[in-house]
Amino acid sequence: MVLLRVLILLLSWAAGMGGQYGNPLNKYIRHYEGLSYNVDSLHQKHQRAKRAVSHEDQFLRLDFHAHGRHFNLRMKRDTSLFSDEFKVETSNKVLDYDTSHIYTGHIYGEEGSFSHGSVIDGRFEGFIQTRGGTFYVEPAERYIKDRTLPFHSVIYHEDDINYPHKYGPQGGCADHSVFERMRKYQMTGVEEVTQIPQEEHAANGPELLRKKRTTSAEKNTCQLYIQTDHLFFKYYGTREAVIAQISSHVKAIDTIYQTTDFSGIRNISFMVKRIRINTTADEKDPTNPFRFPNIGVEKFLELNSEQNHDDYCLAYVFTDRDFDDGVLGLAWVGAPSGSSGGICEKSKLYSDGKKKSLNTGIITVQNYGSHVPPKVSHITFAHEVGHNFGSPHDSGTECTPGESKNLGQKENGNYIMYARATSGDKLNNNKFSLCSIRNISQVLEKKRNNCFVESGQPICGNGMVEQGEECDCGYSDQCKDECCFDANQPEGRKCKLKPGKQCSPSQGPCCTAQCAFKSKSEKCRDDSDCAREGICNGFTALCPASDPKPNFTDCNRHTQVCINGQCAGSICEKYGLEECTCASSDGKDDKELCHVCCMKKMDPSTCASTGSVQWSRHFSGRTITLQPGSPCNDFRGYCDVFMRCRLVDADGPLARLKKAIFSPELYENIAEWIVAHWWAVLLMGIALIMLMAGFIKICSVHTPSSNPKLPPPKPLPGTLKRRRPPQPIQQPQRQRPRESYQMGHMRR
């Protein structure tokens, strides 16, 4: 009982540490909101954009309100992620696949914003980068199986992702012993003479080196071959959803690598050249190397490496498997010389007599029985590709500031290539350290000319103001404003402002059709629960950031409060309380299970509904209810639209028994008990050995042996002997000759 109280206090303290989170989605996502915009309308817009001829119709607009702010997304089909020769391969055919459901864009009028995702069946899924951080949008049924929900999608902020970054010995990456085995294996590759690039011969010395740098200046794109196994397809369900997940991962790492300066090598990008999708129909296909359900992470990487990937910069396999020790990914580490592996590596013979391509890696989206949030998977992908690019794990005080005793450095966190997974919310978590940059720069200088290709530059005429452009109103038959030169103009003029014009409406909502900045009093953004309306400042076309409303302003229909401009805090915090969960085990009425409940800090015994007499001085008897779809009754059910807690037991008793037996927490508790009571384990071990020795000693003298030199076995004392009843004496009969008996028997 004491242990139970301590556990409750610890859980309450953990809730207090993240007190602003009041609507958890699962054990990794502490707060979310539902989205219920019109999917039919968005689907129709997508169909129009897909076959659009006019410039205006090529854009897909999506407006919704969530987390105390307004999202006005303006997106266009993303063609930068797929090469001109892009193919999708299935078990029986190769397709020229339509990727028109993949979009990229921004929040209209918000400088520095960015969005990427897909539109499938009228629903947007992807991520949205804003000034206040990144939001992730996913289908609701991926987390909540109740189909009567009043919303179809969920949206959550990156700060609400609570990923336990100490899982596994290396927190998502294989341990040192695995990498050491891989390193030794990489050293055994047999180099073919024809594979040595001509420019590596130093016959012409510095002159050749200068020429190499010049010719490779635009070769900055790594082309990918990505396969997905049948388990990955089974989780996401459709071919479109699988391709959307791949594009989301590639876009995420593309953003990280493009913004990193690798010692003068800039704008490193990624492009998908080919995708192989193994569907559930390939689960028993003997030609599918990934068909077996129980494959270790090293073997899984080896199966990928046994294929020939000479046509690609890197080749990855995405899966939905729960690998041992919490491993989320594994990849071969590249090197500038001396060993095989990493980017641009060609298939060659190794010490085990097999030809392999070591420009490979693998990624899984499952960890300890649960699916990780997209952000965690994106960072894992960036980490493993970092290995391919030549970076080992960060080490030393310079490159592991998160381990520093200096609080200022520690606050910034560790970098991408840190040995253990990072929480993702620190300044350095999405950056490469100086150690990684030095290592990657050496590999890029040596190898990128072997397989990298030229990337597409910003496109004048796509309606988006990109780097090097002043404005972008489209081509001559599309451009409707008088402020910007269209894309049909000669170089030096196209996508530039016309003389004497201050701005173009393509730059943002604070520019008039007369090419002048709007006055300071004009509104460019509606106010939201937690932010005031946006007002033009009179000297830029972009809509300035809105001022946040005071902290603890009610938002989200008075169920939450504003914190620093975000609708993220619980209404309980407004009165110095903490949010708690009303559970039936505490004697709460069934009607209270879907109420917002509050308690005094660190005192779970005071947990009560906002409509209770206990908190009437704060809420005046007003009952605040949870949103439909919110977890209730201590995560044993979900609130329906009638504010009733519907219990969910989708797994059944057998699945619960399996989870109880194979739960990692069970074995962690056993391991902790063994460490704490090692002496008891030692005594039990000695007792077991003595018991076995005594058993063998006692029973060995009664055990018969075929060895004639050993004494005969002793009879067991007190053994009961069975008495046979007397048999009648029979007269002996004359036996037939053996030969006739055998022949007669054979004839029968």
Curated annotation (Swiss-Prot):
Its cofactor is Zn(2+). Gene3D superfamilies: Collagenase (Catalytic Domain), Disintegrin domain. PROSITE patterns: ADAM_MEPRO, DISINTEGRIN_2, ZINC_PROTEASE. Keywords: Alzheimer disease, Amyloidosis, Cell junction, Cell membrane, Cell projection, Cleavage on pair of basic residues, Cytoplasm, Cytoplasmic vesicle, Disease variant, Disulfide bond, Glycoprotein, Golgi apparatus, Hydrolase, Membrane, Metal-binding, Metalloprotease, Neurodegeneration, Notch signaling pathway, Phosphoprotein, Protease, SH3-binding, Signal, Transmembrane, Transmembrane helix, Zinc, Zymogen. It is found in: Cell membrane; Golgi apparatus membrane; Cytoplasmic vesicle, Clathrin-coated vesicle; Cell projection, Axon. A motif (Cysteine switch) lies at residues 171-178. The active site is at E384. Glycans are attached at N267, N278, N439, N551. Its EC number is 3.4.24.81. The chain crosses the membrane at residues 673-693. The propeptide keeps the metalloprotease in a latent form via a cysteine switch mechanism. This mechanism may be mediated by a highly conserved cysteine (Cys-173) in the propeptide, which interacts and neutralizes the zinc-coordinating HEXGHXXGXXHD catalytic core of the metalloprotease domain. The dissociation of the cysteine from the zinc ion upon the activation-peptide release activates the enzyme. This is Disintegrin and metalloproteinase domain-containing protein 10. The gene is ADAM10.
